[in-house]
């Protein structure tokens, strides 16, 4: 992160702490603005990194049978409250043209898309769209199950509640494929 931007974040954190009545000079808070700026550089790195473009394909005998990577752990920040939400992403696709994506690319794509302020619904759609646009597929299915700190810590205060979102494209819009995906991620 640029020094100027880091300084802006540090000043903003100091202002917030002062506004809520904290003594920003007490021992436990002196370096907090620096720590928060460093943390934001990490958790929002998807905003400053180049667009994810590592869609390495391999030849495969698989022609149209589901490839599923499930339980991809992730965290992101809710764009409404700047509080974390975290959970698991399940991504499946139906290969086309005898090509499959390198398996490590799916968790890397999820991480890249999640490292920015967003909402779970948009994150789900973004992952599906990026895959649909960049690899030859007959369909994509993405499911995310997450706990939102904006629901746990504030507002309705519902600890351990989970939110599930889904996005289906191509053949996964057909009930047979959709059902198979949903059964596999249970």
Swiss-Prot record:
Pathway: Cofactor biosynthesis; 7,8-dihydroneopterin triphosphate biosynthesis; 7,8-dihydroneopterin triphosphate from GTP: step 1/1. It catalyses: GTP + H2O = 7,8-dihydroneopterin 3'-triphosphate + formate + H(+). GO terms for cellular component: cytoplasm. Its EC number is 3.5.4.16. Keywords: GTP-binding, Hydrolase, Metal-binding, Nucleotide-binding, One-carbon metabolism, Zinc. InterPro entries: GTP-CH-I_C/QueF, GTP-CH-I_N, GTP_CycHdrlase_I, GTP_CycHdrlase_I_CS, GTP_CycHdrlase_I_dom. Disulfide bonds: none annotated. Transmembrane segments: none annotated. GO terms for molecular function: GTP binding; GTP cyclohydrolase I activity; zinc ion binding. It holds the Pfam family GTP_cyclohydroI. It is an enzyme of class 3 (hydrolase). GO terms for biological process: one-carbon metabolic process; tetrahydrobiopterin biosynthetic process; tetrahydrofolate biosynthetic process. Zn(2+) binds at residues 78, 81, 150. It comes from the Bacteria. Belongs to the GTP cyclohydrolase I family. Toroid-shaped homodecamer, composed of two pentamers of five dimers. This is GTP cyclohydrolase 1. The gene is folE.
């Amino acid at each position: 992160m640029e020094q100027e931007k880091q300084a802006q974040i540090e000043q903003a954190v100091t202002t917030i702490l002062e506004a809520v009545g904290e003594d920003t000079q007490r021992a436990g808070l002196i370096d907090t603005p620096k720590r928060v700026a460093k943390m934001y550089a990490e958790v929002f790195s998807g905003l400053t990194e180049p667009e994810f473009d590592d869609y390495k394909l391999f030849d495969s005998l698989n022609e149209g049978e589901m490839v599923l990577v499930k339980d991809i752990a992730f965290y992101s920040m809710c764009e409404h409250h700047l509080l974390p939400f975290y959970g698991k992403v399940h991504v499946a696709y139906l290969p086309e043209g005898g090509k499959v994506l390198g398996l490590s690319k799916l968790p890397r794509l999820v991480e890249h898309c999640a490292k920015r302020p967003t909402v779970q619904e948009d994150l789900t759609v973004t992952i599906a769209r990026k895959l649909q646009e960049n690899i030859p597929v007959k369909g994509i299915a993405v499911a995310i199950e997450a706990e939102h700190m904006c629901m746990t810590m504030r507002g309705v205060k519902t600890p351990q509640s989970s939110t599930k979102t889904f996005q289906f494209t191509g053949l996964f819009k057909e009930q047979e494929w959709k059902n198979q995906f949903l059964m596999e991620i249970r």
